[in-house]
Curated annotation (Swiss-Prot):
Protein name: Chromodomain-helicase-DNA-binding protein 5
Outcome of mutating G355A: Loss of the ability to negatively regulate cell proliferation
Domain Chromo: from-to ranges: 499-556, 594-655
Species assigned in the record: Mus musculus
Keywords: ATP-binding, Chromatin regulator, Chromosome, Differentiation, DNA-binding, Hydrolase, Metal-binding, Methylation, Neurogenesis, Nucleotide-binding, Nucleus, Phosphoprotein, Repeat, Spermatogenesis, Transcription, Transcription regulation, Tumor suppressor, Zinc, Zinc-finger
Originating gene: Chd5
């Protein structure tokens, strides 16, 4: 690893090299000097090291080595060179250097040597006479005529400029500023002198800065004076046989290490090889110079922490490279510090630039690869001469022998030992290990060495003894005693100047680690040295170092959990315990881990000695270990005897204890297990009056009801009736089950095996109960990870070794293998995961605890368990009817599938009967299968439980945070889409946290005062939370009265705060949350339940602490924050109210008043009613998730009052609020707020203090005493006992809130209430606060205070409302409208309805509240007051007429069953129905998101029908003003014909009218088709609501294609090809039904199709439908929509005063419709039978009849005189018997064709609107060319057929050829057509176009403010009112991403 530049060791060398380079380069031109800057790069460049080719002069003796034996003679020239090389290079040596040089180079080198020698002699002379004083910087600058820089260095400068690099960076710009043209060489010299002077004047001489300065000053001196050759002071005479150990002069961690490859090359000999080509980086860019010294320091520290093996790793790499005979040339890069040891220039000869350059082997030139001519792509192999040398004829020559020897000498001197001490990471004289690269200071060894040892020396690492095995984990560490010190001799070799003096030579203490060995038990734990751990478990050691404090050993951890006092007493009494505690327990080893739980298996070794596989208590199976027979472990012999006894019991005599072990076992013979009888000895149908003998033997006593349960279970078993034991929680279902299984075993009925599946958290409790109540059972707990389960399968399932294949993968068990266990305990998950093994065993009985896991027959658990081979099933559940009857049926279906297998039949039985009857019927049905007892039935004298809701105030700090959260999230709350559901949930969670405690927010936690031990200051902790203030008072009284408390919270962080609170108050406590696992959990429960336990409180998380825990010793439960799911809270407080409880249980549920918590409590209660009152399939809420509306409602609760406090506070201070207080209606449940308002009203004005106090809850001593009074009446549950206490209404403590008089009452069985929503609530409430906050933020960010514009937000919202009202398409019908919206509904334009209600009626309707969303009346479900029959009638009406029109309430659309409903109720139900229709989700779901039953509603079919009816209605309205109302106008009375078209449209109450909030004038006769289409579009806005997805998707575009089609008629014949091409394009655009035959696309070639739709439509953005010019053109164009014959006919009739008729469907020729019309009209016109032959006219009136009478009401349409024309074509068939059937079939078939054409027309319109085009090169376009070819061929040979018929044989032959050609062309076309669907461009789904999900599009649609696209175009729309109404932004109204599929049935 390279260190940064500028370290102390490198600076002298670095500086000297710079100066020498300066000398060499000063002879060259100035351009070459730029390379100097690169010797001081700002950040190191890590590049491969190369051995320099040319030797440079030595600058420093620093890197010099101690000489070996033969190195002490006087130095020859070669040796001198060698020394110089080793000195100057340090660790730069690399084996990749060249071994041979050219002759010329050799000569040059010799000359240089002589010069150097001469210079060296001069320097020696100087040495003798003393050194000359170097010139000062002032002298130098004066000498060179430069301006000196006068800068006075401050004390700070001496502190900061601690190295040469920093100094240079600081001073160089100052010098350059005064002397802009100073040469680089002079700059460097001046800087060196300045640095020397700066260092000499440094007042901090002892600091590292001074040391660095001295080093560089020394380097500066070497510019002119070379140092004398350093000879090692410790020279040993050559004759001595004993050599000293190897030493070296290390350079510290900042220096590169030498490469190891030298040794390898030496070993291999000097065979020829291709030398590496030299590369060099010159002129490194200046950008790299800007880094600070911080980076250098960071790299230094990185180096210190780097892997200790880095040098050897690098060396190995180098060695590997050296082994190749031929190697590629390596690119040589510049080194950071040492510079480049060659004479080559560091810039390109051609471009004079630096970079990666290739060096010539025969001259100093260098080149870029790209600058050579020709250019080289890569470096050439071998030696390379540059173009200049080749031109001159200079060639490379090998070196002669003496130079090779010189190279060899270098190699011998090469060393790969570390350059720094391994202990202190510092340089200096180092002792090198002979076996590894490690180096050490003598004083760093432990114990330190006084002198260098003789002979070979091995470091501590090489002499470290190996470990006895693999370490599994580190348990503890400690300091050892230091080794005895050596007698300190003379100090070691001299250290560098500036280094601290060596430490005294005394040993230092080392760490020792207490470790657990892998594969060995905790009995074998032992201590190991730190070095052993570091060497053999490096990663584990480093991880431990990182996670633990390595200065102080960890405190002793008594794993047993005993308190110090108890353990001291026990140690005094029990010396064995004291010994174990000292050896094991204090290091965190639990006593249980050293106790044998069970012996699993045995084996014999080669000597015949026996070994046992032992499972240890409280440790998983993968920690099992093999132990020898003679080990001294308590109770080992007893367990061995039990092991052999169990083998004998299960396998018989063969499995006895081996004979040689019998003696040891004799004395334990009496403990042998009793064998169960082979045949039954007791009749299971006979009742036990008292508990049987085998239960007495356990020492336990069953309660009478438990004995009754045992009798019932045994009887059911005998009868073969599978059962559900459904006793209420806390009545001991576990004990009854275990005793039942034990009775089967002990009485000889069954030997097992039994499978028990239970929640993972309760399995420990099951184990304990089995141990207590069934001691003879061999119970195996099958849980844990893969390794543990693998051990269990191999050792616990069978006695045979090969019964199951080993390994982690699960395999089946062999058949007829003896099972080892009696009972297998496992979790739900493993039932499914390890199905292979568990499913292969035949189980005598299955027990499923918490069996409501089986309520869904689609769950994997249900399906897998159903496949097991089970003789008898027993299910345990405390909540058998948790949700609904369907779930109960699934339980019964699992039990007895042969009896309960028809879900529909089962549910029908319970469909229409009242709740009481359902209960009775259920009782009869479940009688044989289910036993359920309640605590109230069983324990008549069991203390009752009382639950109180305790409302708590927010503290001031909480209020601040509550407001802040709401204000900060204003945008999310106020987003017009209602906000993202996830973001609303996040806001709610933040508010819940705030209600609990503000310290749950990191900001508050950081600011909170903290004690020295890290816990929060108690007083501020309490004051910050209203709940804690109350809790403090309550706990004080509860403690004084001797009660014990359970405190539940959902949040584990809240439990942390409660811990701090209890510590502050001085209460002892226990805690369980999700992170505390089985063993620790049970210990905590045992400690709390122990007699005389000191623990006063038990902190539990609601979910983790709610299952399988018995804490009956506590009698007070405080639910600190309610859970989302009320069942979890019930489970929680049932921990205390259970068997063993002898005191009354008080349950206090803390609820923060007027906050989200209070609202959540109400919603949770309502949800509970929903899931339990409704015993009806599909109504149970499957998901506990809140709807977005519920979330919004919860968030609003109490906010009005909270923010009103601010305003009142300002009023009391005489201030005026800046914004008016919005009049926000109080949400339901806000009775408290209402009460507070009343109180305000009665308060005298000005008495604000009293006003404030009146609405705040105060808890004084009297209130607390009353709250804790246990003589209050128990919660009255008697009325609700039918549903087993699930609806126990919460009793609200009336005294808590002073104003509250009454208790909440349940009026009727309201399951769910739909609530009105004010969409502008957040706008009114938070806008001002939000803007204020944004302003504060801006000011704090330094942007200055802005002047706020005064805005009246009420005005703004009214303005918004005005323009939104014009866009009724965007108003939300998905939630019930507010009062204002209701008024919009009622204020209808005059004349639209003949039955207008009076104002009084409307007002009474409006004031009457809506029925609840879900309610139960007489056993039946009502949705918004609609019963099942009415809901069915409404659906039928939708399927008949499509969307209800605006005036549906006053038309025949309102069928008889719906006429009893008020208009408000009807509209509310329409809104709800449409919301459900637009709700994404599977049709298979039982309910919608809000819990309303689906009742088999198929969203697909309903949307399809609505869409088709909408298209039909729109098409009829398009032509209605032209065609009138009557199909046969000559038969119509005169009065009817004279009506205005507008009246004609609306006069029939059954025909839906165009509805718009603003009154529209009736369409005049001249209105364009497009305008009509737009008016038709508004038809879908009935009842102020959006159309659902289908109709939205179908009716988006104007009918511009109709007009375009008319224009087509005027195209000249030569444009026919273009028309065909466009038609083909339309084929590709169309999104029509895949069912329609594709071949029809090419048939109607005479049919006009749209040509260039883009011309008429333009881009959608530029489309302006109400442009007056367009309107002028359109009436004429409208008449061109028909065919030519039709046009002519229409004109003729118009002139003669006859009626006009106009009708067309622009299907683009994709259906047969126009072909049929042409043929039919030709026949009708030619025969004159306009009425009798069915054609276009009849199709129009068929559609008009469908609009009036509904879908497929053929008979009604035929009987209507308005549509008499439809009967005319069939008059001739009237005498036939199947006349009606034939007529209806024809109408149905014809309507299907029209349907298809309408859909295609709509799709074409949309394609044109979106400007969809097909690439002309697309293969599909080839179809057009083929068609032209076919037509051309056919037309040009038409005459042939006549000639052929006339007998012309040549013509006949030609005709045959032509026909063959046509056939081939047509077959090719057919092949192309089959490929079309996959190639055509499709209109992407709306969701894809908008890049929004279906749900988010729906959110936009359901919001009043509309989506952003509307808002963006609002200004344009204000100018065009018609466009506003009829053209809402198209994409956002197409929420159905599967639009194409929905059109398929047509």
């Amino acid at each position: 690893m390279r260190g940064p530049l500028g370290t102390e060791e490198e600076l002298p060398r670095l500086f000297a090299e710079e100066m020498e380079n300066e000398e060499e380069m000063s002879e060259e031109e100035d351009g070459g000097l730029e390379g100097f800057e690169d010797f001081f790069p700002a950040e190191p460049v890590s590049l491969p090291k190369k051995k320099p080719k040319k030797l440079k002069e030595s600058k420093s003796s620093k890197g010099k080595r101690k000489k070996k034996e033969g190195s002490n003679d006087e130095m020859s020239d070669n040796e001198e060179d060698l020394e110089e090389k080793s000195e100057s290079e340090g660790s730069d040596y690399s084996p990749t250097k060249k071994k041979k040089k050219k002759l010329k180079e050799k000569k040059e080198k010799k000359e240089k040597k002589e010069k150097r020698k001469k210079r060296g002699e001069d320097e020696d002379d100087n040495d003798d006479g003393g050194l000359k004083e170097p010139k000062s910087s002032g002298q130098l600058m004066a000498e060179w005529g430069l301006d000196d820089v006068d800068y006075l260095f401050s004390e700070d400068d001496y502190h900061t400029l601690t190295n040469y690099k920093a100094f240079s960076q600081f001073l160089r710009p100052l010098i350059a500023k005064k002397n802009p043209k100073i040469p680089m060489s002079k700059m460097m010299t001046v800087l060196g002198a300045k640095w020397r002077e700066f260092s000499a004047n440094n007042p901090f001489k002892g600091s590292s800065a001074a040391a660095a300065a001295a080093a560089v000053a020394a380097a500066v001196e070497t510019v002119t004076i070379a140092p004398p050759l350093a000879i090692s002071p410790q020279q040993v005479p050559q004759t001595l046989p004993i050599r000293k150990a190897k030493t070296k002069e290390g350079k510290g961690p900042g220096v590169r290490k030498k490469n190891k490859g030298a040794k390898d090359s030496k070993k291999k000999g000097r065979g020829k090889r291709v030398a590496g080509l030299k590369f060099r980086f010159g002129g490194i860019s200046k950008r790299k110079k800007g880094s600070s010294s911080e980076e250098d320091e960071r790299e230094d520290s990185d180096l210190d922490n780097a892997s200790i093996h880095s040098s050897s790793v690098r060396s190995e790499c180098s060695a590997a490279l050296g082994k190749k005979n031929k190697r590629r040339r390596k690119k040589k890069r510049i080194d950071d510090g040492d510079g480049y040891e060659t004479d080559h220039q560091d810039y390109c000869e051609v471009c004079q630039q630096g970079g990666e350059i290739i060096l010539c082997d025969t001259c100093p030139r260098a080149y870029h690869l790209v600058c050579l001519d020709p250019e080289l792509e890569k470096a050439p192999e071998g030696k390379w001469s540059c173009p200049h040398c080749e031109k001159e004829g200079i060639q490379w020559e090998p070196k002669d022998d003496d130079e090779e020897e010189e190279e060899g000498g270098c190699e011998e001197e090469e060393d790969d030992h570390m350059e720094f001490c391994r202990v202190c990471k510092d340089g200096g004289e180092l002792l090198c290990c002979d076996a590894c690269p490690s180096s050490y200071h003598l004083h760093c060894l432990n114990p330190p060495l006084p002198e260098i040892p003789n002979g070979e020396w091995l470091c501590p690492r090489c002499t470290c003894p190996p470990l006895k095995g693999k370490v599994q984990r580190i348990l503890h560490w400690r300091w050892t005693e230091p080794p005895a010190p050596f007698v300190v001799g003379l100090p070691g070799p001299e250290v560098e100047p500036g280094m601290p003096p060596p430490r005294p030579l005394e040993g230092i203490p080392e760490r020792e680690f207490f470790v657990k060995w892998a594969g060995l038990s905790y009995w074998h734990c032992s201590w190991v040295k730190e070095l052993q751990l570091e060497l053999y478990h490096t990663v584990m050691y480093r991880n431990y170092q990182r996670k633990n404090d390595m200065d102080e050993p960890p405190p002793f951890d008594y794993g047993s959990g005993d308190e110090d006092g108890k353990s001291e007493k026990r140690k005094n009494k029990d010396p064995l315990y004291a010994k174990m505690e000292e050896r094991f327990y204090r290091y965190g080893i639990k006593p249980e881990w050293m106790m044998v739980h069970r012996i699993l298996n045995h084996s014999f070794d080669k000597k015949g000695d026996i070994h046992y596989l032992i499972k240890w208590k409280d440790l998983p199976y993968d920690q099992c270990t093999w132990e020898i027979d003679e080990i001294d472990i308590p109770y080992y012999d007893n367990l061995k005897q039990a092991y052999w006894g169990h083998r004998e019991l299960m396998l018989g005599e063969d499995a006895r204890l081996p004979k040689r072990l019998v003696k040891k076992g004799k004395k334990l013979k009496d403990d042998k297990q009793e064998k169960p009888p082979d045949t039954p000895i007791v009749d299971p149908t006979v009742k036990f009056d008292k508990q049987p003998w085998y239960i007495d033997a356990t020492g336990g006593t069953l309660h009478p009801y438990q004995l009754e349960g045992l009798n019932w279970l045994r009887f059911s078993w005998a009868q073969g009736t599978d059962t559900i034991l459904a006793d209420e929680m806390g009545l001991g279902k576990t004990v009854q089950t275990i005793v039942f299984l034990y009775s089967l075993y002990k009485e000889g009925h069954s030997k097992g095996p039994y499978l028990v599946s239970a929640p993972l958290s309760t399995i420990i409790n099951w184990e304990r109960e089995f141990e207590m109540w069934a001691p003879d059972f061999y119970v195996v707990t099958y849980t844990g990870d893969k390794e543990s389960r693998s051990v269990i399968r191999e050792n616990e399932f069978s006695f045979e070794d090969n019964a199951i294949r080993g390994g982690k993968k699960v395999f089946r068990m062999k058949k007829e293998v003896q099972i080892k266990f009696h009972v297998l305990l496992t979790s739900y998950e493993l039932i499914t995961i390890d199905q292979a093994i568990l499913g292969s065993i035949e189980w005598a009985c299955l027990v499923v605890d918490e069996a409501h896991r089986l309520k869904n027959n689609q769950s994997k658990f249900f399906r897998v368990l159903n496949s097991y081979k089970i003789d008898y099933k027993l299910l345990l559940t405390g909540t058998p009817l948790q949700n609904n009857l369907e779930e109960l049926f699934h339980l019964l279906n699992f039990l007895t599938p042969e009896r309960f297998n028809n879900l529909e039949g089962f549910l029908e039985e319970f469909a229409d009967i009242s709740k009481e009857d359902q209960i009775k019927k259920l009782h009869d049905l479940l009688g044989p299968h289910m036993l359920r007892r309640l605590k109230a039935d069983v324990f008549k004298n069991m203390p009752a439980k009382t639950e109180l809701i305790v409302r708590v105030e927010l503290s001031q700090m909480q209020k601040k945070y509550y407001k802040f959260i709401l204000t900060r999230n204003f945008e999310a709350l106020n987003s017009k889409g209602g906000g993202n559901q996830v973001s609303l949930l996040n806001i709610m969670m933040d508010l819940k946290k705030c209600c609990n405690h503000p310290y749950l927010f990191p900001v508050a936690a950081v600011e909170a005062p903290v004690l020295p031990n890290g816990s929060y200051d108690g007083s501020s902790l309490v004051k910050s939370s209203g709940k804690l203030m109350l809790l403090q008072k309550m706990l004080k009284k509860l403690r004084d009265e001797g009660h014990r408390v359970l405190i539940f919270s959902q949040m584990t962080k809240m439990l942390d705060l409660l811990e701090d609170f209890l510590e502050y108050e001085g209460y002892k406590y226990e805690r369980i949350d999700g992170g505390i696992t089985g063993g620790l959990r049970q210990e905590a429960i045992d400690r709390f339940n122990a007699p005389g336990a000191q623990q006063f409180c038990f902190l539990l998380s609601t979910r983790a602490g709610g299952l399988g825990i018995n804490l009956a010793t506590a009698d007070t439960v405080i639910i600190y924050d309610s859970d989302w799911n009320p069942h979890n809270d019930i489970q929680a407080f049932s921990r205390a109210h259970r068997i063993g409880q002898n005191k009354k249980v008080m349950i206090y549920r803390f609820v923060t008043r007027a906050s989200v918590e209070e609202r959540i409590t109400q919603v949770a209660k309502r949800k509970m009613m929903l899931t339990h009152l409704v015993v009806r399939p599909g109504l149970g809420s499957k998901s506990g998730s809140m709807t977005k509306q519920e979330l919004d409602d919860i968030l609003k609760f109490g906010t009005e009052e909270l923010f009103k406090d601010d305003v009142e506070g300002m009023m009391s201070q005489g201030q005026r609020p800046t914004t008016p207080i919005p009049d926000i209606q109080s949400t339901k449940g806000g009775s408290l707020t209402a009460g507070a308002k009343k109180k305000h009203g009665s308060t005298p004005p000005g008495d604000n203090k009293d006003v404030e106090d009146s609405s705040v809850i105060h808890y004084d001593d009297a209130a607390i005493s009353k709250l804790l009074d246990r003589n209050q009446d128990a919660t009255d549950d008697t009325e609700l006992q039918n549903m087993n206490e699930y609806l126990s209404s919460f009793k609200v403590a009336q005294y808590v809130v002073r104003e509250e008089d009454g208790v909440e009452e349940v009026e009727r069985e309201v399951i769910k209430q739909e609530e009105n929503v004010d969409p502008d609530y957040w706008e009114k409430l938070l806008r001002h606060h939000y803007e204020q906050q944004q302003e504060d933020l801006a000011r704090n960010l330094g942007k200055g205070k802005r002047i706020r514009k005064q805005v009246n937000y009420n005005d703004a919202s009214q303005e918004d409302q005005e323009w939104q009202d014009e866009l009724s398409d965007n108003q939300s019908e998905y939630s019930i409208g507010s009062e204002d919206e209701d008024e919009d509904f009622e204020e209808r334009p005059e004349g639209q309805s003949g039955r207008r209600q009076s104002r009084r009626q409307l007002k009474s309707d409006r004031d009457k509240p809506l029925p609840p969303l879900l309610a139960r009346v007489g056993g039946n479900i009502e949705v918004l007051g609609f019963n099942a029959r009415q809901r069915k009638a409404f659906l039928n009406a939708i399927m008949r007429w499509g969307m209800p029109p605006q005036d549906a309430f006053n038309s025949h659309w309102l069928v008889r069953d719906l006429r009893g409903k008020s208009e408000k109720e009807f509209r509310a139900y329409v809104s709800l129905f449409m919301r459900h229709l637009c709700e994404p989700g599977a049709d298979g779901a039982e309910t919608f998101a809000d819990g309303v039953p689906r009742e088999g509603l198929s969203r697909q079919h309903v949307l399809t029908r609505i869409g088709v009816m909408s298209l039909v209605r729109k098409k009829v309205q398009e032509f209605e003003h032209v065609n009138g109302k009557y199909s046969t106008p000559d038969l119509v009375p005169e009065g009817a014909e004279g009506k205005k078209p507008g009246e004609v449209i609306s006069s029939d109450p059954n025909t839906p009218v165009p509805a718009s909030p603003a009154q529209l004038p009736p369409a005049p006769l001249g209105l364009t088709d497009k305008m009509e289409a737009q008016l038709g579009y508004t038809d879908e806005k009935e009842s102020g609501m959006q159309k659902p997805k289908k109709s939205l998707e179908i009716q988006t575009l104007p009918t511009a294609l109709d007009r375009v089609e008319g224009e087509d008629k005027h195209q000249s014949s030569d444009s026919k090809d273009r028309a065909r091409e466009e038609r083909t394009e339309e084929v590709e655009k169309a999104q029509g039904s895949p069912e329609q035959p594709l071949k029809e696309e090419v048939l109607p070639d005479k049919e006009p199709i749209p040509d260039k739709p883009e011309l008429s439509l333009g881009h959608s953005g530029d489309f302006r439908p109400d442009d007056p010019k367009t309107e002028e053109k359109e009436p004429g164009e409208t008449q061109q929509n028909g065919d030519r014959e039709e046009d002519e006919e229409g004109k003729k009739e118009d002139k003669n005063g006859k009626f006009k008729f106009m009708f067309n469907i622009a299907d683009g020729g994709f259906t047969e419709l126009h072909t049929l019309w042409q043929n039919e009209e030709r026949a009708a016109v030619s025969s004159g039978k306009i009425y009798e032959i069915w054609h276009r006219r009849h199709d129009y009136w068929l559609l008009a009849g469908i609009v009036t009478h509904g879908y497929a009401r053929w008979q009604d349409i035929q009987n209507d005189p308005r549509y008499m024309i439809l009967n005319e074509p069939f008059k001739s068939e009237i005498h036939k018997g199947n006349y009606l059937e034939m007529k209806n079939k024809f109408l149905a078939r014809r309507f299907k064709l029209l349907e298809q054409a309408l859909v295609i027309e709509e799709q074409l319109r949309r394609a044109a609107y979106l400007n969809m085009t097909q690439d002309p090169n697309h293969p599909a376009m080839a179809l057009n060319a083929r068609l032209a070819e076919v037509e051309c061929l056919a037309e040009s040979h038409q005459h042939l057929s006549k000639e052929s018929l006339a007998g012309n044989k040549p013509a006949n032959a030609v005709l045959h050829k032509v026909l063959n050609q046509l056939e081939e062309l047509l077959s090719d076309m057919k092949a192309d057509v089959t490929r079309l669907p996959s190639m055509l461009s499709r209109i992407p789904p709306v969701a894809a176009r908008l890049q929004m999900s279906e749900r988010s599009i729906l959110s936009r649609l359901t919001n009043r403010a509309g989506d952003p696209t509307i808002q963006q175009t609002s200004s344009r729309r204000r100018d065009f009112p018609l466009f506003q109404r009829s053209f809402p932004a198209e994409p956002s109204h197409l929420p159905n991403p599967r639009g194409r599929e929905k059109l398929q049935p047509f």
